[in-house]
């Protein structure tokens, strides 16, 4: 493999055995592609905004004399960029402008004669835009729209599993689900009649809907039944014989062939052998006794030819009297319905008998009554209602997906078709459910991923936009019908408010629009790849059963079987598998390699869950020879959702990668294959809660996906084009672009601005640091700067800690963690948290609030950190209770005391008119002020601090832009100088020229002269562009802010808090091994090895066997080897060994392992590159052991040998306190530990006096409410068990809800009198009132 200059800085040793056929696709594409489809102009009009507009327009007036047509739309440019939106607290959106055409028709002239056409561009609200990283900024906060897994539109057949009826009979049902519109259900009842429901309302006999579709009884019977033909001959009947129909029946008469010999005697069961004999003898007719027809149903009406009287009506039972009547009337041929209990049930025939309607109108009225109970039906209303239910494109849409699923399920050859239902569709569904009831077909599996599809951002936004448009449509139609249209323009008809409101509601408050989880890069990516079954149109937690939540065979390679939350949402919220993507219909697909005649090709095809069922698919870990032919004869594979063994020649596809089945979070766990799934689930979930540490450190033992994740997450800065680094500082990187990647006539400079110390959604710190140096070559895709939790472009969520598995004086009992003081001293787990505190000055009824340093009754010392405007200065160190922003609020006139009146008379000032309402630092918070923002309403005078901040921002903008301009100008000038050099000018001549003259020289070569003129033109453009950009920036900075009504000023103060690790913080490994720090132990007391190196963390070995996450032990061994190799390299460098020896050792390390795919050609590295690589490997060689394809035990032992460590992975340890050796050797190595965002500082809380609940008068609960500790029934039992009566009494009275007792006790404590008198708890009064509310009077006897 060829490595770029920056990749050679540190290469991860990969133990993967399988070739990488396909790179993991871009991780955020599910979000970005979906939204792109929504906003991009689609000429076909099948999706996005275009589809929404075309579905609603044209809007015709009621009279038909005018209509409003849609022409095209365009999205404008957003006013503020993403960062400005976050600071100002506004939505990152672009205005939508739509070109509409209003057409007026001439009433007098012939139909369709156009009288007037007016075209105009109309503003239709703002559409929120997606940032480059797949998020939305709504009101200043980053949000993610989670994709939804919902039941695909189409037709589904199911049964109730025998749960509806007490007999346990299985009742079948069919449901047609449209994309929008009414649901149509067919269901059998226990008596085998077929019923229909519309929108889950009252059920009606299913034949009513057929009558409403203009089918007569005769036609209905012909649709669903075959006929049996009889001829009447004297005393017998002759039946037309279809031998197959007799199978399984018991002969009620002798069956004879044409010659009259008996084939089946009466009372015998007819078998397949008998049928074959009948077919051989070509018997076409059978004589049957007259009684045979009795009880069968007539297939048509039989009418007396003379009188016209109906002798036997269709679907009525035939009796001997009916036969006699028919004979008399001279009717010789009779048809009956072919009904057979086994496989041709009389369902429709039975249903027709229940059906009270006889014609279309009655059926329509019946449907109308069911849909609109209590309304008087009229013919027109009933027809219109039925028409609108399933046959109107405005009200009903199966959608493209729905039509495809519908047609495929009912074996209709074409995938395309109308979005509304037809008569034939409804009949086909009824036929199919009868087919299933007859036992010829299977019901569907609704949890199969072929029946559930993904609805992503774009589709949901489009639906919401359509909702807004439909609201507008009603208003437009009314306006078109009113008033004089000659005066009106399209703009006067359209009100953009409903559209904006619908879109805003979706992005702001939909269940699927979620506050982004921004703890670390992994949590961001996982959140964007989350697939939820909840939300509008989805399931609810309460209704979701076990089957929906369970892992389904079709999840393979599509949804991760591991990563899902614990708790009530388990299985309802899933994560996309690493290689999965959605197809054009919204179904999940996963890639497979094609296999032809047992030979694996590199051709990759994506298959959906439905397609996959047809093929035989082998796993990725099968043995293959050098030619790609499968070695084994019998191969483990999957077919139709089952695991089986098949011959190599039968295999059609093979998995692309062993990591294919799991999500990115799960594939970050090394040795995942050795962990129990429950613990792997916790490991995958807890990595998302890791807080970015002060100094990120790459994991020594990783899986090789760390780089992909860091790059795709968008937290690192990635080079867009190749070149070399021209300039680097903490906030900017400048890359001079390679000649061959330049666009003609451009400066060839790329500038990357870095994000510094900003706050994330979870209050962690986002900060980017350059990881490149001036002069270094860069290729496209190289990482130029690290973000939070990344190290040299690798995801780095935690720290590599030296671990020993041993008990230590009970300090690691029950998953507690003992850590060394050194970890705290070296700031290994120190994290920075940034809090945003806001102070809002409002206009109140009594006057406006004021931000000032002049605060009543506050001493000088408390104001020491404020400037003259009353706002804290940047860099101030503050603690709980300090004033950050001084604010006074006017208060109403109160009754003055005589002393105050005297003071007022002497000094004549109204000092007491305002009260202090300053913003203070919350208790228990201590930190440094890193930024202050002041937002002032338009028209309100800016204070001194606001002006200062503005000037500072303008100066910064000018500096940034002028530096950018200088860099770009230099780029243009250097290209011009090169041209002049090539045209015969000497270097001294060029150097002596003033800058402005370089571009105005005259050259003989015409082509070069043209190029120079182009450069001069470009220089002018740059200048103009600079002025324009600066003016826009200045205007944005100085303009007033759009604040909420009644708000005059907002001051936001950002406070950076440094949190060191301490007892009570939660830590975890990557294998679900979590625990709480119990003690920080002095370094000298920690166990140490023979070299005197103490361990960092002591874990309890009992946490491993019962949890079955052995992956952590293998990680510790491998970590020890990786660190040991790093130590060896360090020793070599310190001893200044020959470079060849270092090169040889590094080469040996990278070549270790059986059949590993990675090839690192250390020999081709220059001496400098080897030296830099060695320097970067001093802390340990990073290792990749991919999930299901990782390092074997043998390879771990080889690594330990290379590192000069015992292959057992165990060392002698000595007790730090006594110096004695422990009696057994201890497993010591390196494990990657994470500090989770469950910090004791955020949880620790104690209540003194505080607020009480209104009804029970008990203290509130929780830190946010400054609540008390709950003393529940179990705690009461404990005190009862100990007989601690007085303690229990005060817990239940004065410390809780004895209102008088607690007030009295407070006074007593203040007076120094430590007495208490418990009274009646308020909760007892509540109980009395509850009982009285039931009408039972209870009174207490006061004795």
From Swiss-Prot:
Source species of the chain:
Shewanella sp. (strain W3-18-1)
Out of the domains of life, which is the source?
Answer: Bacteria
Q: Which gene encodes it?
A: rpoB
| Protein name according to UniProt | DNA-directed RNA polymerase subunit beta
**PROSITE patterns recorded for this chain?**
RNA_POL_BETA (PS01166)
Q: How does it assemble?
A: The RNAP catalytic core consists of 2 alpha, 1 beta, 1 beta' and 1 omega subunit. When a sigma factor is associated with the core the holoenzyme is formed, which can initiate transcription.
GO function term, MF aspect, one: DNA binding
Q: What does this protein do?
A: DNA-dependent RNA polymerase catalyzes the transcription of DNA into RNA using the four ribonucleoside triphosphates as substrates.
Cellular component per GO, a single term: DNA-directed RNA polymerase complex
| Similarity section | Belongs to the RNA polymerase beta chain family.
The cross-references to InterPro entries, in alphabetical order and at most eight, read: DNA-dir_RNA_pol_bsu_ext_1_sf (IPR042107), DNA-dir_RNA_pol_bsu_external_1 (IPR019462), DNA-dir_RNA_pol_su2 (IPR015712), DNA-dir_RNAP_su2_dom (IPR007120), DNA-dir_RNAP_su2_hyb_sf (IPR037033), RNA_pol_bsu_bac (IPR010243), RNA_pol_bsu_CS (IPR007121), RNA_pol_bsu_protrusion (IPR007644)
GO BP term, example: DNA-templated transcription
Please provide the record's keywords in A-Z order.
Answer: DNA-directed RNA polymerase, Nucleotidyltransferase, Transcription, Transferase
The kind of enzyme this is, by top-level EC class, is: transferase
Q: EC number(s) per UniProt?
A: 2.7.7.6
Q: Which Pfam families match?
A: RNA_pol_Rpb2_1 (PF04563), RNA_pol_Rpb2_2 (PF04561), RNA_pol_Rpb2_3 (PF04565), RNA_pol_Rpb2_45 (PF10385), RNA_pol_Rpb2_6 (PF00562), RNA_pol_Rpb2_7 (PF04560)
**Signal sequence annotation:** none
Catalysis performed (reactions) = RNA(n) + a ribonucleoside 5'-triphosphate = RNA(n+1) + diphosphate
